[in-house]
């Protein structure tokens, strides 16, 4: 190999190594920018749709909301026990009729979450407090109902689940469907007054738990502790 050819090969090798180093450094920088929250980087927002904020007036103690495919929004009012309808950005004056009796006699009791079945947004689920009498004393429990939404009213209202345990704490309840169409229902109220969350560790009550239910309110067969 001649001296001139050897020199050309060395120059080519050096250029290749430098080029690879630049690419590697750039890749490392990209990775760092992608995963290191402490490094500032530019986020392109020019192709994001415009967002219009429309204030909705007239709601009282709104607790939760759910969206229909047609754009309607259902909103629960916790302390009034009303189910309200927002359509085309405006609150409909009349509330949805057919809602069962909601117990609102204690602080933080009332109508709570609202959710639609993933296969049919006319099938609606609500959680709320229900008044019961135990040994002559007025108590409250959390229940789950299912109903059919017919325009501006509920039909076929059915109580499909009642939580075990008297709610003497703050048993707020939320709903969410999983990808396999099981219904998750959270229940607060783990604290008994000034206690330390005893209900959360008590398998005999549902308070302080996250429940996994079928869409008819029955427990899923492969749930843990299903026989307790």
Q: PLM ranges: what are they?
A:
Residues 8-20:
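Bacterial N-terminal signal peptides
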Residues 26-194:
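Acidic, Gly/Ser/Thr-rich repeat motifs that build Ca2+-stabilized beta-propeller blades
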Residues 17-29:
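Bacterial Sec-dependent signal peptides at the C-terminal "C-region" and cleavage site
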Residues 185-192, 218-226:
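The feature captures the short pre-catalytic strand/loop hairpin that immediately precedes
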Residues 193-201, 227-228:
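Short helix/strand-bridging catalytic loops that position acidic/His residues to coordinate divalent metals
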Residues 163, 170, 221-228:
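Short, surface-exposed recognition loops and adjoining beta-strand edges that mediate ligand/DNA contacts
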Residues 1-5:
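N-terminal secretory signal peptides that target proteins for export/translocation
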Residues 140-151, 199-216:
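Beta-propeller blade signature
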């Amino acid at each position: 190999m001649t001296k001139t050819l050897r020199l050309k090969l060395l120059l080519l090798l050096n250029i290749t190594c430098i080029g690879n180093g630049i690419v590697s450094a750039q890749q490392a920088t990209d990775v760092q920018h992608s995963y290191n929250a402490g490094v500032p980087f530019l986020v392109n927002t020019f192709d994001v749709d415009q967002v219009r904020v429309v204030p909705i007036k007239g709601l009282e103690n709104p607790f939760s909301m759910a969206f229909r495919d047609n754009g309607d929004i259902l909103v629960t009012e916790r302390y009034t026990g009303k189910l309200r309808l927002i359509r085309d950005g405006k609150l409909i004056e009349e509330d949805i009729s057919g809602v069962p009796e909601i117990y609102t006699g204690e602080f933080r009791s009332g109508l709570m979450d609202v959710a639609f079945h993933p296969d049919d947004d006319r099938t609606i689920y609500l959680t709320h407090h229900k008044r019961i009498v135990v040994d002559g004393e007025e108590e409250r429990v959390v229940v789950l109902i299912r109903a059919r939404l017919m325009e501006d009213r509920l039909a076929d209202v059915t109580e499909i689940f009642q939580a075990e345990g008297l709610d003497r704490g703050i048993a707020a309840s939320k709903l969410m469907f999983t990808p396999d169409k099981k219904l998750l229902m959270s229940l607060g109220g783990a604290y008994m007054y000034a206690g330390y969350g005893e209900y959360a560790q008590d398998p005999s009550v549902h308070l302080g738990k996250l429940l996994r239910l079928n869409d008819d309110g029955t427990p899923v067969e492969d749930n843990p502790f299903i026989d307790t």
